[in-house]
C-alpha cells in the first residue's frame, strides 16, 4: 500500500466520516518520519482541525524537539506514542542503519522531551520480536519508572506489539512470543506498575 499525506481538506473529510461511525472522542494521528512534509507546522494544523471533532488528540510521529511538542500542546495535543522498538543500542543500528530513525539516543530521549514540554500522556513500548523480550521489557520498565519520578504529573501507557512472521519470505522476527508469555508479561507489568 503506497503511503500518502492527506491534505487538510481530506483530513477533515476523514474526521467527519469517523464521527459518523459513532461517538468517538479519541483520535490518533500517525505520520512517517518525514519532517519536511509532516513536521510541526503540518501537525499543528492537523490538530486544529481534529479538535473540532475529538476531545482527546494523540500523535504517533517521529521524535520531535521539546519545543515542537510544547507548540503542539497549544494546538490541543493530549498525548504522544513513541516506540523505542528495542533498547539494545548495538542491534538498533542493524534495524535502522541510516536516516533520522538511526539516532538511538534521539529516540530513547524522546519521552524526556515530551515530559519537559508538559505532554499529558506518553505511550511507549518495544517491538516484541526484535530482541529478547525479557531484556527489552526490563529496560522499558526502568525507563518508565524514571519518567514517572521525573515527570510525575504525566500519565503513561505501555504497549507490547508482537511481531509475527511475514508471508512470502518477508521479515522474520528474531523471537516469537507465545500467548502464555504475553500473559506473563502483562501480569508482571501490572505488579510493577499498578496504573
Where is each model-derived feature located?
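Conserved C-terminal portion of the radical SAM core fold
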Residues: 29, 79, 105-169, 181-195
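Extended interfacial segments that mediate partner engagement and assembly in macromolecular machines
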Residues: 12, 16-17
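Short, small-residue-enriched loops and turns at beta-alpha junctions
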Residues: 33-38, 128-133, 175
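N-terminal active-site wall of soluble small-molecule enzyme domains
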Residues: 41-48, 182-188
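Core AdoMet radical
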Residues: 2-10, 21-40, 49-114, 120-124, ...
Amino acid at each position: 500500500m503506497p503511503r500518502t499525506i492527506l491534505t487538510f481538506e481530506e483530513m477533515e473529510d476523514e474526521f467527519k466520516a469517523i464521527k459518523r461511525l459513532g461517538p468517538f472522542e479519541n483520535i490518533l494521528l500517525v505520520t512517517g518520519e518525514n519532517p519536511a512534509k509532516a513536521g510541526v507546522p503540518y501537525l499543528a494544523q492537523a490538530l486544529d482541525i481534529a479538535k473540532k471533532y475529538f476531545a482527546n488528540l494523540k500523535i504517533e510521529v517521529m521524535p520531535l524537539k521539546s519545543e515542537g511538542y510544547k507548540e503542539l500542546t497549544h494546538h490541543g495535543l493530549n498525548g504522544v506514542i513513541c516506540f523505542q522498538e528495542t533498547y539494545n543500542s548495538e542491534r538498533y543500528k542493524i534495524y535502522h542503519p541510516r536516516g533520522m530513525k538511526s539516532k538511538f539516543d534521539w529516540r530513547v530521549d524522546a519521552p524526556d522531551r515530551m515530559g519537559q514540554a508538559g505532554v499529558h500522556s506518553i505511550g511507549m513500548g518495544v517491538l516484541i520480536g526484535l530482541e529478547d523480550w525479557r531484556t527489552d521489557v526490563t529496560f522499558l520498565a526502568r525507563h518508565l519508572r524514571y519518567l514517572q519520578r521525573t515527570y510525575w504529573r504525566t500519565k503513561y501507557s505501555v504497549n507490547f506489539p508482537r511481531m509475527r512472521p511475514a508471508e512470502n519470505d518477508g521479515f522474520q522476527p528474531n523471537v516469537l512470543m507465545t500467548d502464555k508469555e504475553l500473559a506473563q508479561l502483562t501480569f508482571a507489568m501490572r505488579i510493577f506498575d499498578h496504573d
